[in-house]
Structure formats: C-alpha cells, structure tokens
Design a protein with these regions (language model features):
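Short acidic, glycine-rich surface-loop motifs adjacent to enzyme active sites
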Residues: 39
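PLD/PLD-like phosphodiesterase catalytic module centered on the HKD motif
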Residues: 1-25, 30, 43-156
Length: 156
C-alpha cells in the first residue's frame, strides 16, 4: 500500500508535495480498465480533464462519473458528457439525486488499485486557486473506495 499527500496552492506544492491536478491527469492517462469518479462540482474550467476521460474511453476504459445533480449544471460540460455517453457504451454518467443527502465526495478510482481522495472539485478553484489537500492511495484501500462508489451507483 502506498499513500502520498497531494495539494494545491504554491505554498503547499513547493515543498515537494505534488499538485492534485497533475496527479489526476497522470492516473487518468495510465488507466487501463476502469475509472470511477464521484465529484460535487464539475465546471468547464476542468474541461481538459473531460478530454482526458474521452481519450481513456477511446482506449476502451470503462468510465463511471457520479455527479451531484444540484451542482453540476455547466452546459459545456453537459454537452461533452452527453457526447461521451452517446459515443461510447462503456461510459456512464449518473446524476446523483437523493432526497436525504447530497453527494459531496471528490474521489477518483482507477483500475480499483489507485485512488485520489481529497477536497478538490473539478473546477478552476479546486485545481488551481484554492488551497486543497488530498491523498493518492494505491492498493487495497483503493479497492475499498471503489466498492463505496459501486454502492453510490446503486443508491441513485
């Protein structure tokens, strides 16, 4: 099992801590079988990450995005996600709706072996301008996080 601390903000990442966004890019590019993402906010300022997901879909990677239906309403993102779902049968977008709770997680799991868990939304603030902290975990904990995301898919 491997654990690495990630962050955003120049004062945080200058001390050898890797940035959240470059690590997200890296794990998406390295995905071979599956990507699961749960996120509270997804905006067009993170469109490049959606492009990376499109590249992964072209490689045959199964992708599941679980989005908070109340906060993920960016039109440009919606059009791109609709295109991905229509173009690739192995891409699934779940607009999480619950009368009791909101989806507030910010999690990515790749191949059930690598997970990024943190505070950063898929937005300009989350990737660049806010101070965010996250962890990259590899091994069994990533598998456990994937199982939680599987359960979230069933709740909706």
């Amino acid at each position: 099992m491997t654990i690495e601390i990630l962050g955003t903000g120049p004062e945080i990442i200058k001390n050898g801590t890797r940035g959240v966004e470059p690590v997200i890019e890296e794990v998406i590019k390295n995905a071979r079988k599956e990507i699961k993402i749960a996120v509270y906010v997804l905006t067009s300022r993170a469109l490049h990450l959606i492009e990376l997901l499109a590249d992964a879909a072209k490689r045959g990677v199964k992708i599941t995005l679980i989005l908070n239906a109340r906060t993920c309403r960016d039109k440009e993102i919606s059009l791109k996600l609709d295109y991905l779902v229509e173009s690739f049968p192995h891409v699934r977008v779940i607009n999480f709706r619950s009368l009791k709770k909101q989806l507030h997680a910010k999690v990515i799991v790749v191949d059930r072996n690598t997970a990024i868990i943190g505070s950063a939304n898929f937005s300009w603030g989350g990737m660049y301008s806010n101070y965010e902290i996250g962890v990259l975990v590899e091994g069994n904990p990533a598998w456990e996080v994937a199982k939680i995301l599987d359960q979230l898919c069933l709740i909706n």
